[in-house]
């Protein structure tokens, strides 16, 4: 279990995988084939090649060891597990040496658009990479600017955390964007188009935009990969999306986190991976921009549904059934739009869904919880100082589902509750009364 858990945080290699089959003969004379996956032969270090040679011998020892917790068999299994772990660590170190990049060394300035909790956390994450890296936050609030520049604290979000001194804030787009090597976009989706149009004259056409915003534009059904180039008037604007299970507060506390960057430009994704990766943040890469964006948008709506179930005290059985159904609905729509199924079971899919649906730090889950407890949506939204993207995304999701002819009963119910056309209690009754069908 330790090895499996640790594998989540080991470096990701974008190179093709090689499969090595080892035939092992057990004492019962039944032939067992074990398959090992690794980098292509050209990427193997000498140490890895040597380790490959005795893999069959150790596998045979593990298979032939007597069952049970005691005796020599237990010691042998522990020895095999220990050696496997040591090999994993050696491979990790070797991979890091081979894949060192000068991205961090050559990056002089990064700009962050937006001063919310996640934009602030990402600014701190990047600023910690090296002391002479200039990180400029473009904000609209003069008070927050002064707080960051004078006290190194965002007085509005994450107030208990001091920011690195190489982070500065400004309300001037020209000052913030001048000479930037990378741009992190952390403005809520519904405000992104107008915001970007306002700063477009200051944006270098080759400046890579890394989107942190999750959701769909309500009236147009556009994702950020469509909004950014269109708002900037540059269809070739380099674009990357960053997503995955991550709360800003835990990033600030340097707790272990894993995320994914997706871009159609493989080299650009690898560059952003190197820019962000740290001992507490593991970054994987993907070329499935559609899958990462759609999963990130739809999980917010599902989180509202999960919160409603919690607020109504409907129990764990109901919660599990609802989230499972919601995951299926997300898969149906995303794959129709061209997403890869593997993306939906990865960090930006299942990982982000689990975090957002089951953890109280989730804004969207808390909106649902309060709706399920009987509060009115207007009261809930007026009491929040941050945006819950799932509220505005819900209607767009259903319009998108109709466009692609996909039935989404759970997410449709959320949209109707938000529009005040259905009470949570009535929604549950109608969902439970749907026809008993074959699971797909």
From Swiss-Prot:
The lineage of its organism: Eukaryota, Viridiplantae, Streptophyta, Embryophyta, Tracheophyta. Its main location: plastid. It is found in: Plastid, Chloroplast. It is an enzyme of class 1 (oxidoreductase). Keywords: Chloroplast, Lipid biosynthesis, Lipid metabolism, NAD, Oxidoreductase, Phospholipid biosynthesis, Phospholipid metabolism, Plastid, Transit peptide. Its EC number is 1.1.1.8. Residues 57-76 are annotated as: Disordered. Substrate binds at residues 214, 363-364. Belongs to the NAD-dependent glycerol-3-phosphate dehydrogenase family. GO terms for molecular function: glycerol-3-phosphate dehydrogenase (NAD+) activity; NAD binding. Residues 1-47 form a transit peptide. This is Glycerol-3-phosphate dehydrogenase [NAD(+)], chloroplastic.
